[in-house]
Amino acid sequence: FSWDRIVERHGHLAAIRESMLGLDDLPPATRLALIAKLSDTLAQFVVARRWLSSDRAERIVVEARDRSAINLATRSRGDETGQLVLHLRATGQLTAGLILRALLSGNLELFDRALVELSGLPSHRVAALLYDRGGSSLDALLTRAGLPSSTFPAFRAALDATNEIGFVGTIDGAARLRRRMVERVLTRCEADPDVSEPLLILLRRFATESAREEARVFCDQLVADVIDIAPEHQRIAA
């Protein structure tokens, strides 16, 4: 049987989706296709109820899909990441916005693989062009990959920030660092009079999302600390 065929024919059925999403060995590309089906179903529902406009519902769906793609790519290993990139390209989801989100999220493997796929260049050549500090090589690579030139300043600023502040491995650290990355890129792009307004709008959305995620992680950690401390206080009181 084919996972893709099942998703295509029955992915709109909640029972089928839930059963498949509960499988530990479900390929990431198939999992993302199911998430896309669910997102489309929810978008159609809220638009039909006139709770959201079709434009806003579509934007929310795209952002949710992109976040899911980044999360799945982070948990993928080896060929799974490559298959996920192929799926993203085949479904029109391998966009400049997704690739920029991957870079700002610290997922350098997805970022590199996406550019390898879109440019048609071998991975070692892409790596050499990406990290050539001259600047023109990066523009040439992004152009070959078919990304809009209006997004180049953000990619350049993000790579510079990556080289300057790097990434750390903990969940909490990644949240803080991601916010620093986004804010640094946004600040640099806002200072450039040639940067397009749509790019600034996208970066501001990323900034809001990263700040919200950092606050969530902080609150989760605070609650966990309180839970850990409570039994000790009870023993002392006794």
Predicted regions span which residues?
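Alpha-helical scaffold segments
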Residues: 1-238
